């Protein structure tokens, strides 16, 4: 029997339905807002996996093209292949806030699948899927410390809006997805048109308040349809064995974790672990994995204690201190812009490539086909962390990090009308020890400036961390990879000197107090301004000239009625122009022609041909043209591509001409003046009139 639970959000009905569809799943919910509908299911395996050191959670988000009343445009006419970027990002958006809410030590596989089955093209299904994931877990038999909810926050004309439509978001200066529980925020992700920390905090707190009815809705759902949760007892810790590990390793770990240098620290800890295993291995030969797990837990505990009770960081920095920074620009000769940004043991090579319209990315989405003229790709090869493993395509993490850096920089790029290039940035992570995504933002900014892209303002980014217990809370600036591992928060903030352009916050604790959020943002502002100062010391403003290897783009405006002539029958004319001039030509219905060439000479040659075709001859106009044919009565002169006029023999010179070829020959280029254009389009030309005019 289906039951429906409803509330109102931003003047529209928001509903959860359960009990009718996908009843064999542990939890199944249909979320509807407007005419956008998402089915979300949650299932957990009955048996636990052996020796699992992480939560075996998988989140999938699928957008069915039929949801928009369309047939997929690929050859097979069905959804195939790897998930789209939007699907990958939304799966991460769901995964990150729910992951900390499962029982510690849970080892049975959990799978959450969100499927978009209807879309009205107004209400984005991603936040509906997030709410649905929590709701499905709430009503399932899977232990889950929810509920949480999520929604999008926009701001139009200074007014905050909860779950604005896709159309409303076009006029919003903030786009923020906030996830939270009844009492606190658990995840934040979004971008903004350079807004202050105070405005961003206000947006986050507005979102948290606005989502409360969605949390209540889930509580009502659980009360009515919730299944009894599985009995689960976290794995018991052998206190006697743990005591032996502590006795053997605690003091040595305390020294080892404070070893300077990432690999030196890793080696020092490996040496201690090896010693512990060798000492206990004979007596506990069948429990080596358990000893390794205990050792890892002890490393975290000792590292946290150093921060919380000894007021120190493991690398000796102050809590608000940024690692040493070096910046270089112009490090690669042929790409159109490049920069090497190094912060501590994190290093990113930023590479800029400029292209033209055909280089834009074309994407099939639920809302139709879209194009993107700015792309940012993030690569994290195994050598960047000293590992030897398969180097495949981009992972979910790579896509997510690239998207965050894209958000940070997209807000400062010039309008396409002012800068007609397609822009591709690549962040190649050369070394990583914390916050390579923010390193990509910094390297990307410098590469753009090195390439002469007129950005509105340079952007820098920083990652903040948190270590907290019942008594103490410490916010860390510019966290190491180890601090991310043993800490409670990863909070990335990017922006200009004036404000924030992007941020992303994930936590490992159940919720984040408001006071900590305020402190983290304020401390992040100080840190990223420090980084920005170091960047500007290398390159203060974008270069006034682009790379000589960047394509040249020339625009020509013609009469729209002439577009057919530019293209020619079956595209013959435009293909001929492109082949002859080694250019790429785009034709807009408005008559705007964009020509992309490898050099100025080719571009100008193509522009001249296009202008010639696109212009209408004018009476009295003077043109330079080629004699294409001579007859007894005159010469035909091509004054533009596809347009010939006749110079009668009497108009060839200001003296009597007996024979046309005595004055002009085929292939000769001459200057002529238009005397007349008849009703049927015939053009009378004259050389004599031009000679008389120039006397």
From Swiss-Prot:
CDD domains: KH-I_PNPase (cd02393), RNase_PH_PNPase_1 (cd11363), RNase_PH_PNPase_2 (cd11364), S1_PNPase (cd04472)
Magnesium is among the record's keywords: yes
Positions that bind Mg(2+): 484, 490
Top-level taxon of origin: Bacteria
GO molecular function: 3'-5'-RNA exonuclease activity; magnesium ion binding; polyribonucleotide nucleotidyltransferase activity; RNA binding
Top enzyme category: transferase
Domain S1 motif: 620-688
Catalytic activity reported: RNA(n+1) + phosphate = RNA(n) + a ribonucleoside 5'-diphosphate
Cellular localization per UniProt: Cytoplasm
KH domain mapped to chain residues: 551-610
Cited Pfam families: KH_1, PNPase, RNase_PH, RNase_PH_C, S1
Primary subcellular site in the record, as a coarse category: cytoplasm
Entry EC no(s): 2.7.7.8
Keyword terms, alphabetized: Cytoplasm, Magnesium, Metal-binding, Nucleotidyltransferase, RNA-binding, Transferase
Cofactor(s) demanded: Mg(2+)
Listed GO biological process terms: mRNA catabolic process; RNA processing
Alphabetical list of InterPro entries matching this protein: ExoRNase_PH_dom1, ExoRNase_PH_dom2, ExoRNase_PH_dom2_sf, KH_dom, KH_dom_type_1, KH_dom_type_1_sf, NA-bd_OB-fold, PNPase
GO terms for cellular component: cytosol
Function of the molecule: Involved in mRNA degradation. Catalyzes the phosphorolysis of single-stranded polyribonucleotides processively in the 3'- to 5'-direction.
HAMAP family: PNPase
Similarity comment: family membership: Belongs to the polyribonucleotide nucleotidyltransferase family.
UniProt name for this protein: Polyribonucleotide nucleotidyltransferase
Organism from which the protein derives: Desulforapulum autotrophicum (strain ATCC 43914 / DSM 3382 / VKM B-1955 / HRM2)
